């Protein structure tokens, strides 16, 4: 499957791969937070300080990884900011696996809300 096809499945997330085929290959999954994607889920913890920014997505992703894909914890790294969720690795397949699983979780708002209930505010 091409990256274009993968990215259609992952919208509004975007998978980017840099320097593919070299020692310096790097893959990143990003979500620019310029829309209200799944804001209603984060609003369930608004009184606790969750606002749906990149750091909150980070907190959700950590719970997701711990519970669903613990084998990826050591190979993925976060580089989120207030307006951007970003996770990446030199292991392109690990980023793809995370991306597909994380997007599937986001498509199930009850699962997403459940995982967010265990997230720790950053």
Regions found by a protein language model. Give the residues of each.
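Structured alpha/beta or helical-core interaction and ligand-binding surfaces enriched in interleaved
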Residues: 1-97, 104-122
